[in-house]
Swiss-Prot record:
EC number: 2.1.1.170
Catalytic reaction equation(s): guanosine(527) in 16S rRNA + S-adenosyl-L-methionine = N(7)-methylguanosine(527) in 16S rRNA + S-adenosyl-L-homocysteine
Residues reported in the UniProt entry to bind S-adenosyl-L-methionine: G62, F67, I113, E114, R127
Family membership: Belongs to the methyltransferase superfamily. RNA methyltransferase RsmG family.
Protein name: Ribosomal RNA small subunit methyltransferase G
Length: 188
């Protein structure tokens, strides 16, 4: 289940640049309560060691300050990332970070995913947005039976994913939930 993590040569440099941008914006706009983003960066990219996340097109729902999407986009430059964030100060920050980090594989959508034009993604990620089944519902039109979902969840997740055949990897207080909807039947 472990994959060797092979990050692009510029990854650490870009993370440092992101940290500076984040610190500057966070003082004014209160994007997040994180003071040190090191653990959040590691949490964001940990699934790359665990699951096969290869994708041509990926969506992150409720991107907030960019965890995990910015770091997955840095680590997966071959993937086109679509970040959906309806809160203006956060989507503005994400757009600024995209430009400053030179992330040409990333597009910021300043809207709720439910209101966006539909397209099919290979991978859909989300962290701390909503219950898993609610996330599946709001993403209708963006997935097919082959689309993989990667959901970052806290420690109590089993009831939330009942009825979903998923791989679950636990580390500390984090559960990484990975699944697709092939042969799942209707999820309620």
């Amino acid at each position: 289940m472990k994959n060797e993590l092979c990050l692009p040569a510029v990854f650490d440099e870009k993370v440092k640049a992101y940290a500076q941008i984040f610190t500057k914006f966070n003082k004014v706009h209160s994007l997040s309560n994180y003071k040190d983003i090191s653990e959040q960066v590691l949490d964001s990219i940990k699934p790359l060691e665990i699951f096969d996340l290869s994708a041509k097109t990926a969506i992150d729902v409720g991107s907030g300050a960019g965890f995990p999407a910015i770091f997955l986009a840095l680590a997966m430059p071959q993937t086109k990332w679509h970040l959906f964030e309806p809160i203006a100060k956060k989507s503005s920050f994400l757009s600024y970070a995209k430009i400053e980090l030179g992330l040409q594989n990333l597009e910021v959508h300043s809207q709720k995913i439910e209101l966006a034009d539909k397209f099919t993604a290979d991978l859909i990620t989300s962290r701390a947005l909503s219950k898993t089944k609610e996330l599946i519902k709001i993403c209708e039109g963006f997935y097919d039976e082959n689309t993989k979902f990667l959901i970052y969840k806290g420690s109590s997740v089993m009831e939330e994913i009942s009825g979903i055949d998923a791989q679950i990897y636990n580390e500390k207080n984090r559960n990484y939930i990975y699944f697709n909807l092939k042969n799942q039947g209707e999820i309620r």
